[in-house]
């Protein structure tokens, strides 16, 4: 076939699709040292190719300038920092085996095929996944994740991941840092719940989250996670949230612990409020505000901003 600049016509599958997103966030805080207004962006393109109609090869490419630490962007659940450099952030392949859907890949969460029940869209990063980010939404690197849907509301998942698979420590060795996780969930018309167990080499976590959407009332979501580290005291964390249609958009309010709290330590909480308005199918505008309590009687961090 004809070639243009070294690329052969037809070299891409006719079933390859591309979608992308660009996000911008601006805001500032009060009550901490850095009180200047800050802004950041995140861009991602997602390529999906099917060879059989039932499988999918996924390649994600992204860039952004979100710093690892500062008083505002470190609090919000926004994008990733890559120093304005394009990089492959995810490469995985999904295929069916019997009734199972199996995903294998690099930079892949062990929970990729897990089913969660939290429907609250948080602003503060610590409130993500209704506080179950170490169990129901456990991360990973070189991973295999499998899910099975019984078609009656129940689903199950299992995940294995090696954090050092590309290093000399190897995968699933005594020296490596590995993840083993299990998940079960049930979904009905107006409620859902999910549980998960994850062993992340240095600790074990149990998590549960749920949501309920009563007719004519806001959707209620909540989650709780218990951590049992190999050394040290146990940890707990939780988050709850409400979301509801309001005018042309959706309002969301939530609160929870500011990350995991070690038994006997000071309990610190975070609160957030946001409103999302969709201009069209591809663009939305979300103003938000949050409060994160300060440790040891220090000043709380209060922030306001917007994302588009």
Describe the role of every protein-language-model region.
Residues 1-112, 116-165, 174-189, 196-308:
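Beta-barrel outer-membrane channel/assembly domains of diderm bacteria
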């Amino acid at each position: 076939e004809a070639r243009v600049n070294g690329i052969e016509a037809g070299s891409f599958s006719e079933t390859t699709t591309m979608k992308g997103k660009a996000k911008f966030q601006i805001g500032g805080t009060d009550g901490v040292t850095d009180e200047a207004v800050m802004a950041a962006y995140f861009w991602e393109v997602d390529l999906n190719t099917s060879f059989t109609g039932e499988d999918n090869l996924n390649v994600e490419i992204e860039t952004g300038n979100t710093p690892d630490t500062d008083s505002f962007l470190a609090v919000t659940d926004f994008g990733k920092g890559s120093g304005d450099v394009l990089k492959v952030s995810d490469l995985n392949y999904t295929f069916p085996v019997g009734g199972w859907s199996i995903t294998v890949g690099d930079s892949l969460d062990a929970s990729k095929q897990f089913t969660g029940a939290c429907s609250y869209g948080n602003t503060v990063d610590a409130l993500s996944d209704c506080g179950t980010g170490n169990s129901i939404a456990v991360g990973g690197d070189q991973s295999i994740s499998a899910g099975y849907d019984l078609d009656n509301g129940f689903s199950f998942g299992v995940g294995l991941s090696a954090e050092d698979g590309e290093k000399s420590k190897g995968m699933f060795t005594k020296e490596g840092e590995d993840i083993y996780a299990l998940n079960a969930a049930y979904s009905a018309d107006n409620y859902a719940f999910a549980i998960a167990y994850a062993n992340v080499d240095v600790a074990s976590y149990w998590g549960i989250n749920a949501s309920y959407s009563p007719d004519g009332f806001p959707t209620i979501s909540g989650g709780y996670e218990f951590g049992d580290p190999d050394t040290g005291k146990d940890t707990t964390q939780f988050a709850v949230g409400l979301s509801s249609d309001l005018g042309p958009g959706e309002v969301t309010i939530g609160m929870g612990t500011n990350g995991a709290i070690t038994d006997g330590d000071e309990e610190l909480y975070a609160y957030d409020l946001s409103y999302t308005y969709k201009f069209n199918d591809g663009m939305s505008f979300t103003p938000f505000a949050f409060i994160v309590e300060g440790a040891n009687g220090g000043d709380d961090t209060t922030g306001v901003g917007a994302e588009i």
